[in-house]
Regions:
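Conserved catalytic submotifs in the C-terminal HATPase_c
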Residues: 87, 112-123
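Short alpha-helical segment of the dimerization/phosphotransfer core of two-component systems
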Residues: 59-64
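Acidic ATP/Mg2+-coordinating residue in the GHKL
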Residues: 170
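Short beta-strand/loop element within the Bergerat-fold HATPase_c
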Residues: 150-162
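Short helix-loop "hinge" at the ATP-lid/N-box region of the Bergerat-fold HATPase_c
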Residues: 142-144
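Conserved micro-motifs of the catalytic ATP-binding
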Residues: 79-84, 124-127
Length: 279
């Protein structure tokens, strides 16, 4: 009887997929109608409050889409019985793809992105490509959410005796602590989020046997520190590592997908302005 009760209350993968399709289809419909209304207003005119109402609906739909995507991915990870198959990848190349969007970020958010390899030209690590991309994207997204216009985010990579250390440091609102002003600014920066991004980052690290810590930046802001085991697999005679090869089409698809994910993240960012105006 207990087994039958459990089976009745469970949801199958097919049922979950149908729920996802309905949700995303509805969100896409909201987005298309918001776009139509904006074009209609441009032709016929509309007062500022009406335009703002439509913009708010569009922003809420984007945030819901982001939260739903994160929740679904997190549930998939938590329900998987085994960890993903890891392959050697060049982390430097992945970070270059992320940093390649720095011009777009500067133009839209007024935040500078700096990439610092510390003299490294390649960084071979064992990883799942999808998990590594999600991790880098969400660490950058968190840093951008915390940053103000005119701020900067530094993505740095260093090798130690025991591991690679990837850090993402911002000069933004910092971690919420006992200081009331800092806590309020942190809340404003991440207002409207379900705070699934950090959970997703930790889960990506767990699946790849990496580790993640958050700590205060030296002067102001937050530093995310990812410790990655050194590659211990087979190497060629010249010391290089044979990476998993992808076709040119696959590489271009990855770059486009990464950019598309970052564009969506940026559309959920709070409006920039003078922090004194918020309090």
């Amino acid at each position: 009887m207990e087994q039958q009760k459990t089976e009745t209350r469970s949801i199958t993968a097919e049922q979950r997929k149908r729920v996802e399709e309905v949700c995303f289809r509805s969100l896409a419909l909201i987005g298309r109608n918001c776009e139509y209304l904006e074009q209609h207003f441009d032709r016929t005119g509309a007062d500022e409050s009406t335009r703002q109402a439509v913009a708010d609906i569009d922003t809420a739909a984007i945030q819901l889409d982001r939260t739903l995507t994160e929740a679904i991915t997190l549930l998939e990870f938590l329900h998987e019985d085994t960890k993903p198959q890891l392959y050697p990848i060049d982390l430097c190349e992945l970070l270059q793809q992320v940093a390649a969007q720095s011009d777009m970020i500067r133009a839209q958010l007024g935040v500078d992105i700096r990439l610092d390899y510390g003299g490294c030209t390649a960084c071979c690590v064992m990883a799942d490509r999808r998990d590594a991309e999600l991790l880098c994207l969400h660490l950058l997204s968190n840093a951008l959410h915390a940053s103000r216009e005119g701020g900067s985010v530094c993505i740095a990579l260093r090798r130690t005796e025991s591991d690679w250390q990837l850090t993402v440091t911002d000069d933004g609102c910092g971690l919420p602590g006992e200081d009331v002003q800092a806590a309020l600014e942190n809340r404003r920066s991440f207002l409207g989020g379900a705070q699934l991004g950090l959970l997703l980052c930790r889960e990506c690290c767990r699946r790849m046997d990496w580790s993640l810590q958050l700590e205060p930046a030296p002067e102001k802001g937050t530093k995310a520190v990812v410790n990655i085991p050194l590659y211990t697999g087979e190497s060629r005679s010249d010391g290089t590592v044979e990476l998993r090869t992808d076709s040119e089409t696959e590489r271009e698809q990855r770059k486009y997908h990464l950019r598309a994910m970052l564009v969506r993240e940026m559309r959920t960012m709070p409006e920039r302005g003078d922090p004194e105006d918020e309090f």
